[in-house]
């Protein structure tokens, strides 16, 4: 049988479909380059139809819309619509038409609220739902609502723990296909998203978007409660949970709850001990790729985040945000117990332990307990003897990068932290905080034995020796001991 080709613009059904679906926008989609191949005689009036339909014109079903006409056509017919830009084949004219629109700059569907335009009606509908926050699909477990049933189904996997998508390389499972695709790039080292500004490549488009803000300096998402700003909408949403105190994600192992699913996932590694991300430079392993990326900057010395006020650079964006508060004097985090304010949430959390006396972090080696996880990590190095941070100036080695930074300031003489009261400058923010207590008269460290209070924890430690009558310092010459 001879094969004929027919240019789609000659088909009445195409013109009818476009005119019927979008009459207001007056869309006349061009089909001259789209070819429809068939094995019978060309001409729309001779299309093979189902029983009872003599011609397209007489067919009653197609008068409603295009889908009706499509039902009339025999499914065995070869209907191939090829996109000109990419070699993609479609078995439905609607799919071909929808796909082609993505390559054009014509966006005929406009949102009346924000004036944003879209090339497809479905995209506009989706956009409107987000704007009006019409959440049709609700989670029965926590009451959280979603715009789409597919999003609800994905969300439900958080509660059920279902992870149907497994990595063939390492066996790790995920609850979403997108997460598996993203994970696979760890093994392939593929980085398809490249920054046009500096050439740096990333394995996620979201990471590139976040990175671009380094160059623009844009922080568009602002918290109404504490005026803190973020470069990502997701980070603002996460931050808001601090104010509400809501913690939806609970660890089945120990019962600890978190306000983010990612934090729960991160926490679970404490129980499993799993560390997938290894540093090629020193062999140290991490449970998060982002932590590995930050760690690598210790070796490279890269500090991409620079303060416009004083020129100081940082390895992490969060460190720059915290640093800026030194210049602005902003202290959004206040202690409900004593009214003291802080420029960082972590500092407030650390401060609260003074009132509670809680020490949840215990060393598995010697049993010593700490009020901060960072303090426990620092302590653990006593047992391992690890000192990865070396000062090039003095040759001194440190187990913490912060200690190395302090050492470097001794050589440079740099003193960034200045007291507004007397003008005295310091090379560490913690020293400035301790110094300020001289002016305020604050003494947060109290002796349980006699009730005497001190402005520094080290002074309290020294004072406690009086009660224990411990003679720590002995003279080698005469043997006399003193406190």
From Swiss-Prot:
- Function field: May be involved in transcriptional regulation.
Pfam families, sorted = zf-C2H2, zf-H2C2_2
Zinc finger regions (C2H2-type), where?
109-131, 137-159, 165-187, 193-215, 221-243, 249-271, 277-299, 305-327, 333-355, 361-383, 389-411, 417-439, 445-467
The family database entries (PROSITE patterns) matched by this protein are listed as: ZINC_FINGER_C2H2_1 (PS00028), ZINC_FINGER_C2H2_2 (PS50157)
Can you supply a Gene Ontology BP term from the record? regulation of DNA-templated transcription
Q: Family membership, please give it.
A: Belongs to the krueppel C2H2-type zinc-finger protein family.
Listed GO molecular functions? DNA-binding transcription factor activity; DNA-binding transcription factor activity, RNA polymerase II-specific; RNA polymerase II cis-regulatory region sequence-specific DNA binding; zinc ion binding
Q: Gene encoding this chain? A: ZNF117
User: Superkingdom of this entry's organism?
Assistant: Eukaryota
The name of this protein is Zinc finger protein 117
Which of UniProt's keywords are assigned here? DNA-binding, Metal-binding, Nucleus, Repeat, Transcription, Transcription regulation, Zinc, Zinc-finger
Organism name = Homo sapiens (Human)
Q: Where in the cell is it found?
A: Nucleus
What is a single cellular component term in the Gene Ontology annotation?
A: nucleus
């Amino acid at each position: 049988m001879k094969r004929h080709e027919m240019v789609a613009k000659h088909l009445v059904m195409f013109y009818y479909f476009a005119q019927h679906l979008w009459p207001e926008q007056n869309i006349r989609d061009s089909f001259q380059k789209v070819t429809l191949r068939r094995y019978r005689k060309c001409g729309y009036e001779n299309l093979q139809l189902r029983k009872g339909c003599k011609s397209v014109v007489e067919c009653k079903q197609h008068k409603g819309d295009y889908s009706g006409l499509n039902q009339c056509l025999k499914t065995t017919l070869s209907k191939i619509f090829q996109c000109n830009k990419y070699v993609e084949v479609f078995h439905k004219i609607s799919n071909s038409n929808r796909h082609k629109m993505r390559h054009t700059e014509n966006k005929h569907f406009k949102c009346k609220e924000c004036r944003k335009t879209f090339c497809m009606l479905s995209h506009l509908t989706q956009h409107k739902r987000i704007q009006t926050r019409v959440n049709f699909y609700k989670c029965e477990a926590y009451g959280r609502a979603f715009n789409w049933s597919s999003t609800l189904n994905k969300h439900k996997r958080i509660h059920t723990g279902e992870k149907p998508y497994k990595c063939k390389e390492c066996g790790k499972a995920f609850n979403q296909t997108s997460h598996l695709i993203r994970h696979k790039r760890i093994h392939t080292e593929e980085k398809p998203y490249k920054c046009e500004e500096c050439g740096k490549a990333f394995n996620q488009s979201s990471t590139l978007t976040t990175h671009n803000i380094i160059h623009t300096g844009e922080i568009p998402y602002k918290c109404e409660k504490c005026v803190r700003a973020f470069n990502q909408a997701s980070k603002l949403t996460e931050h808001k949970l601090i104010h509400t105190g809501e913690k939806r994600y609970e660890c089945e192992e120990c019962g600890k709850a978190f306000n983010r699913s990612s934090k729960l996932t991160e926490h679970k590694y404490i129980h499993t001990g799993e560390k997938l991300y290894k540093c090629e430079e020193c062999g140290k392993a991490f449970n998060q790729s982002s932590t590995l990326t930050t760690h690598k900057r210790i070796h490279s010395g890269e500090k991409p985040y620079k303060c416009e006020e004083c020129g100081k650079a940082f390895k992490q964006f969060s460190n720059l945000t915290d640093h800026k508060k030194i210049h602005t004097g902003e202290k959004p985090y206040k202690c409900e117990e004593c009214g003291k304010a802080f420029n960082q949430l972590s500092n407030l959390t650390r401060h609260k332990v003074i009132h509670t006396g809680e020490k949840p972090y215990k060393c598995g080696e010697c049993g010593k307990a700490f009020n901060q996880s960072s303090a426990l990590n620092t302590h653990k190095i006593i047992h391992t003897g690890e000192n990865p941070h070396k000062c090039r100036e003095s040759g001194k080695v440190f187990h913490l990068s912060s200690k190395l930074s302090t050492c470097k300031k001794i050589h440079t003489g740099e003193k960034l932290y200045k007291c507004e009261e007397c003008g005295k400058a310091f090379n560490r923010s913690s020293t400035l905080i301790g110094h300020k207590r001289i002016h305020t008269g604050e003494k947060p460290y109290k002796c349980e034995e006699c009730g005497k209070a001190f402005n520094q924890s080290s002074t309290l430690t020294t004072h406690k020796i009086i009660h224990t009558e411990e003679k720590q310092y002995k003279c080698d010459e005469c043997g006399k001991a003193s406190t």
